[in-house]
Design a protein with these regions (language model features):
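Catalytic-site microenvironment of enzymes
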Residues: 1-289
Length: 289
């Protein structure tokens, strides 16, 4: 198990890497997972290290854009489906509800959107009910928020007496979509997925390369971080293929990467993501009418 002290050294970017190198000098304990952290590729943006800067992309709203209804699905929280458990032992359903509420508040503050969080957390909510609710409400886009788990899993102790899963090898976001069904609706889903990934990358977030997705999702040739559902037909994601409006699923980050999970608790990251979402929705919905 990796101690919190050793991992924190690895979270601090270049300074942390130097400190971790000293900690791993000959004669001192050598933790294999901690050593691997030194070899992680660092994206030009530096994400997900603490010093990496995030920015708020500017949204361009065309004349007549009006106020658009956006249904925000806080992923999981369905009967018997709590989602993953993060590197801080937080259930995915708790993270997604918090993230969806934060996004709704920020989108609504623009005056350009009426964003609604479909799940309140008071009871497990089946996905079919969410899709029906979005249609009844007249949502123009369905955005499902999640976190992902990838790669080889170690364990660490973020607090005394607690053991949580950890994996530092595959940070980044992914935007999933489905080409199943009506081709015109599929084209609108793809446009929405590409707009979100493009604007999230512009905000300074890292698109995931997809190494762990082989056989599950196929990468988009035009936009990094976008993947189409290629699971067996009976296992494909319900909220990507059933809504009558364009729908996407955003794997916001790698829940087992302590650097990235920490960044997603920061107001600056939530602000940048909300700005990217507003810009993406303006891009994708602004040309429709």
């Amino acid at each position: 198990m990796i101690s919190r002290r050793k991992l924190v050294l690895g979270l601090a970017g270049a300074a942390g890497a130097a400190a971790l190198s000293r900690a791993l000098a000959p004669g001192l304990p050598r933790d294999t997972a901690a050593r691997r952290a030194l070899k992680l590729p660092i994206a030009p943006s530096g994400w997900p290290f603490p010093g990496a800067r995030v920015v708020a992309p500017a949204a361009v709203f065309p004349p007549g854009f009006g106020v658009r209804r956006i249904y925000l699905d806080a992923g999981h929280g369905a009967p018997g489906n709590t989602g993953n458990v993060s590197c801080f032992c937080v259930e995915e359903q708790e993270f997604t509800l918090s993230a969806a509420r934060a996004l709704a508040e920020r989108l609504n503050a623009t005056g350009r959107f009426e964003a609604r969080v479909g799940r309140t957390g008071d009871r497990p909510l089946p996905y079919a009910e969410r899709v029906e609710d979005a249609a009844r409400w007249g949502a123009e886009a369905f955005v499902s928020l999640h976190s992902d788990v990838r790669g080889r899993i170690d364990t660490w102790s973020p607090a005394e007496g607690r053991s949580c899963p950890l994996s530092l090898a595959a940070p980044g976001f992914a935007v999933l979509w489905s080409d199943e069904g009506n081709p015109a609706l599929g084209a609108r889903r793809l446009a929405l997925a590409r707009a979100f990934a493009r604007r999230m990358e512009e905000a300074g977030l890292l698109p995931y390369g997809g190494a762990a997705y082989s056989g599950l999702y196929a990468p988009d040739a035009a936009q990094p971080g976008v993947f189409v559902d290629r699971r067996p037909q009976d296992q494909r994601i319900f909220v990507l293929r059933r809504p009558s409006m364009p729908s996407i699923l955003i794997e916001t980050h790698h829940a087992l990467d302590a650097r990235e999970a920490t960044r997603w608790t920061e107001p600056a990251t939530l602000d940048a993501f909300a700005a990217a979402a507003a810009a993406a929705l303006a891009d994708a919905l602004g040309g429709e009418g």
